């Protein structure tokens, strides 16, 4: 259970970063691979503990000049570190991993090696490349495993900063959950290790960056792209929910794009296993929070369905449906489910979004119903997989 101080219900703090829409922050976030850059002049997006200012990548070394930390962070819980990675010969250069059969072979090779060899990773096993992202707790770098030449993303987090923010448990949860998930639309966590001052997460590299950055670049998406992304996300969430995992922080900043433009869910820091199917902690981005969470009521996996509706709206319109200049106004709009559609949003899209943004969570469409919705079927270029995604991705596990 998250600590009380993680709750979003606190006074807003003005952002001073000159990039992107002004964001009201409560605390900071572990960095993702690709920080989004946004245009100015937009209303504030109210953020909760899982968010931070997206600072443009800065070239710096991840290991130099760091003083030892007296207080040690206990080793992260979860699976043992993954073994030495392996991939096809073509991955010798720092480029996106191949898709299709080559990608399946890479994943199969990795898993076989994981099963046959168990070892402790160290920083010496990797060649460190350019920075991909920078955040409050550390940085993300493009990296290459020396022996196999496998290209990946290495998230480097500083223990002293994790301790000061009191988010060790959040990191442990992210490692525990994400390392066990196998789906083509979920970013893979291969393993982790740590030294005296840092924690390292070995992640799949998503070369096309965040959906947030792409959305800011294009202002909004067309119906075909939106429906395709919603299909991929619904497939991934269906898989997560079948594993009793609730993400709780679905938003453009936490969605990455693979080499073929496929969507990948990342940042599972606010996700939870759901043995009781209920969690009451308020977390994530306020714009994407459902009424039951901001009102402090019990909630289940249906919170992700609400976020799916908000996401679909933002993809088509270019801004979240409940966005306002103040925390209080955003809160009020969500509680009353007050939003309107621009004239250019089609009837099919309006129907889907309206049936997801229901105050009563039991009245929201299920993920299966989302995948079978006429607007999705008419516009998406990807087929639904739902719970069958496990079978479809067995080769990559």
UniProtKB/Swiss-Prot annotation:
GO CC terms: axon hillock; basolateral plasma membrane; centriole; centrosome; chromosome passenger complex; ciliary basal body; germinal vesicle; glutamatergic synapse
Pfam families given in the database record: Pkinase (PF00069)
InterPro entries: Aur-like, Kinase-like_dom_sf, Prot_kinase_dom, Protein_kinase_ATP_BS, Ser/Thr_kinase_AS
Localization per Swiss-Prot or TrEMBL: Cytoplasm, Cytoskeleton, Microtubule organizing center, Centrosome; Cytoplasm, Cytoskeleton, Spindle pole; Cytoplasm, Cytoskeleton, Microtubule organizing center, Centrosome, Centriole; Cell projection, Neuron projection
Annotated GO biological process: anterior/posterior axis specification; apoptotic process; cell division; centrosome cycle; centrosome localization; cilium disassembly; liver regeneration; meiotic cell cycle
Active site (UniProt): 249 (proton acceptor)
GO molecular function annotation: ATP binding; histone H3S10 kinase activity; molecular function activator activity; protein heterodimerization activity; protein kinase activity; protein kinase binding; protein serine kinase activity; protein serine/threonine kinase activity
Tissues with expression: Detected in neurons in brain cortex and hippocampus (at protein level). Expressed in mammary gland and tumor.
In-chain residues carrying the UniProt-annotated modification Phosphoserine: 40, 50, 335
Every Protein kinase domain range: 126-376
Induction notes from the record: Activated by progesterone.
Residues annotated as binding ATP: 136, 155, 203-206, 253-254, 267
Subunit structure: Part of a complex composed of NEDD9, AURKA and CTTN; within the complex NEDD9 acts as a scaffold protein and is required for complex formation. Identified in a complex with AUNIP and NIN. Interacts with CPEB1, JTB, TACC1, TPX2, PPP2CA, as well as with the protein phosphatase type 1 (PP1) isoforms PPP1CA, PPP1CB and PPP1CC. Also interacts with its substrates ARHGEF2, BORA, KIF2A, PARD3, and p53/TP53. Interaction with BORA promotes phosphorylation of PLK1. Interacts with FBXL7 and CIMAP3. Interacts with GADD45A, competing with its oligomerization.
Family: Belongs to the protein kinase superfamily. Ser/Thr protein kinase family. Aurora subfamily.
Designated name of the protein: Aurora kinase A
């Amino acid at each position: 259970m998250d600590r009380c101080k993680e709750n979003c219900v606190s006074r807003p703090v003005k952002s001073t970063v000159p990039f992107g829409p002004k964001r009201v922050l409560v605390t900071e976030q572990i960095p993702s691979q690709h920080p989004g850059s946004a245009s100015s002049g937009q209303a504030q997006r109210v953020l909760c503990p899982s968010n931070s200012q997206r600072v443009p990548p800065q070239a710096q070394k991840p290991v130099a000049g760091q003083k030892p930390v007296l207080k040690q962070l206990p080793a992260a819980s979860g699976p043992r570190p993954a073994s030495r990675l392996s991939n096809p010969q073509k991955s010798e250069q720092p480029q996106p991993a191949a898709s299709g059969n080559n990608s399946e072979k890479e994943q199969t090779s990795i898993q076989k090696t994981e099963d046959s060899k168990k070892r402790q990773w160290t920083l010496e096993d990797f060649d460190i490349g350019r920075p991909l992202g920078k955040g409050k707790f550390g940085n993300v770098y493009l990296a290459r495993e020396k022996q196999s030449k496998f290209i990946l993303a290495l998230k480097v987090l500083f223990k002293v900063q994790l301790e000061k923010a009191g988010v060790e448990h959040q990191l442990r949860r992210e490692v525990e959950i994400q390392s066990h998930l196998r789906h083509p639309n979920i970013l893979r966590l291969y393993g982790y290790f740590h030294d005296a001052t840092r924690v390292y997460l070995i992640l799949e590299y998503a070369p096309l960056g965040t959906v947030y950055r792409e959305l800011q670049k294009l202002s909004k998406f067309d119906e075909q792209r939106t429906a395709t992304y919603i299909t991929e996300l619904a497939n991934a969430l269906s898989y997560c929910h079948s594993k009793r995992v609730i993400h709780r922080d679905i938003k453009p900043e936490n969605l990455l794009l693979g080499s073929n433009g496929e969507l990948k869910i990342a940042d599972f820091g606010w996700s939870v296993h759901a043995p009781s199917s209920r969690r009451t902690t308020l977390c994530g981005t306020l714009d994407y929070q459902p009424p039951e969470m901001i009102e402090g009521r019990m909630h289940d996996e249906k919170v992700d369905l609400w976020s799916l509706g908000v996401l679909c709206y933002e993809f088509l319109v270019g801004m979240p449906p409940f966005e306002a200049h103040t925390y209080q106004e955003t809160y009020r709009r969500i509680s009353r489910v007050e939003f309107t559609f621009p004239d250019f949003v089609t009837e099919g899209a309006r129907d889907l979004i309206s049936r997801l943004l229901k105050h009563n969570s039991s009245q929201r469409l299920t993920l299966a119903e989302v995948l079978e919705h006429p607007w999705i079927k008419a516009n998406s270029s990807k087929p639904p997989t739902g719970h069958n995604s496990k079978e479809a991705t067995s080769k990559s596990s």
